[in-house]
Amino acid sequence: MQFDLVLTGGDVIDPAAGLRGMMDIGIAGGKIAAVAPSLAGNPARKTIDAKGRLVMPGLVDIHAHVFVNAHDMGGRTDQICGCSGVTTLCDAGSAGSSNFAGLRHVLDTEVRTRVRAFVNLSAIGITGTSRGGELSHFPYADPEGCARTIVENPDLAIGVKLRFGPGLVWEYSAEPVKLARRTADMAGGVPMMMHITDSPIPLPALIEHMKPGDIVTHCYHGRAHGIMGQEKQFLLKEVVEAQRAGIIFDCAHGRNHFNFRMIERALDQGFLPDTISTDLTVTTATQGPVWDLPTTMSKLLHFGLPLEEIVRRSTAAPARIMGLEGTVGSLRPGANADISVFELREGAFELRDSDGDTIVAKRRLLAHLTMKDGRVCYERPEGT
């Protein structure tokens, strides 16, 4: 068959599809048409040489904030994503029932990146980094409106978002979690995502009200009541049991939620994140310490998480949670031709966590080319 484009000679890595090794990828009509050791016998309108590069599915970031101009967090989606190999992301509760239409307008008119969104339990959504908690005042909670928004926006809204932490909720008990879970049930049993950093109460008291498929985000924060309790030495048995039961643990780096000592201890004890994400905002994308998803992936690579598992947790795993399994996050024939090409650069790279600690990594992932629906949307300038 004739391809629109063939990506040749790259080191393909897609653990979910069982692909690893030097392969060519043929693209036609915006879809993956063929993956084989060689497609040299097939005509193509364009060929891109990927020799010496890693070729992965387009990255999927399940936790970011992209409601631009609505608060001080939202970043320019396409600018942030293209240069980092991300082709799909999920906005994690920036908007609630009262302003979700505004988020949709921004995405429909200004954004090419594929986006899904969690709807905040608070009607007003996240107001920013310095204006207090969106659920510190109980009347802002809008379970009926949140559920209705999810039901009325099936192409965009995928679940309920709750931020549980100091100053973020109206009371420090499990009641906000119970309300968020009931809201998710009202919306048809969609997942809820819960922010847990610096929780005022122990984590087991919260996760006991979650269901399989729900998401605990910021699982590697180093503050109060995390996955290792107050001693911060050993994983809580309730956390291990919750993950085994199907609760999703997402790392979501962010400004305050990614601690190297917690990561090292958790990985040493066999606790891997189910998904790798950024919690990216305009500030953390431009001033650090997050920068982008490949940087977060590189930090986990430094601590010994195998590259194949990093790719799985940054592509197929979040795609499945977002209801996009088989469409994105995969290089299987028939999937959208979302492809990221990376250089695994060697050197000495100083990387920082959310609490100011640094590591010197020997390897770092750098996006070389990003393709969405078969079209190149980013190429790294030569010599950079």
Identify the function of each model-found stretch:
Residues 10, 25, 30, 52, ...:
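Divalent metal-coordination and catalytic microenvironments
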Residues 162-287:
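Active-site core of metal-dependent hydrolases
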